Design a protein with these regions (language model features):
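Active-site helical microenvironments for divalent-metal-assisted chemistry
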Residues: 1-183
């Protein structure tokens, strides 16, 4: 399984190209890797781990779902590749500024929350790990934005109640601690 995850990591890194994390000089791929590592302590499901590595590819790169599927078919069976792509699609923001420029941030986030509440339990589980990793970085590097962001993600975790219970509780603890540390 580690060999497969290495190939998927390389694909994700290539897809993200020269993209860097917003608050550090790190290649973007460090974030999906950390998300995947968090999930590894809760599941060995290859589809969840692969989707974690690719969760921002559709949102942040020109790579398409079909290109991801074609790549995954080299390493996973068809059912696993399809499930992984479905998870990546679930985790891709729909109500973003690019697609909905007339909606303000609050409205976009509310619509996105309603959408996320309907995604699969596995998708919600990945979202918990994604939030945990982003909270660490944003809380430390952008305290002004963190005040808004932390309330948004707390609301997401409270609403997304179908994923891995232990990871959801851990994510809620991380967010609540970050909120407490803001004061």
């Amino acid at each position: 399984m580690d060999d497969i995850l290495k190939h998927i990591t390389d694909f994700g890194d290539t897809a993200h190209g020269e993209q860097l994390r917003k608050y550090s000089p790190d290649r973007y791929m460090v974030h999906p890797i950390r998300v995947m590592e968090t999930l590894k302590s809760h599941t060995g499901d290859i589809c969840i781990l692969a989707a974690a590595l690719l969760h921002d590819v559709l949102e942040d790169t020109p790579v398409t779902a079909e290109e991801i599927r074609k790549f995954l078919n080299k390493y996973l069976n068809e059912e696993e590749a399809d499930r992984t792509v479905d998870l990546v699609i679930e985790l891709t923001d729909v109500y973003d500024k690019k697609n909905y420029p007339r909606l303000n941030r609050r409205t976009r986030k509310e619509k996105e929350l309603q959408r996320l509440a309907r995604i699969s339990p596995d998708g919600q589980t990945i979202k918990y790990a994604d939030i945990m990793d982003n909270v660490q970085e944003i809380s430390e590097e952008d305290t002004d934005f963190a005040r808004v962001y932390l309330q948004e993600v707390r609301k997401i975790i409270l609403e997304l109640n179908r994923g891995n219970v232990a990871l959801r509780n851990e994510a809620l603890r991380v967010v609540n601690q970050a909120i407490a540390d803001q004061d």
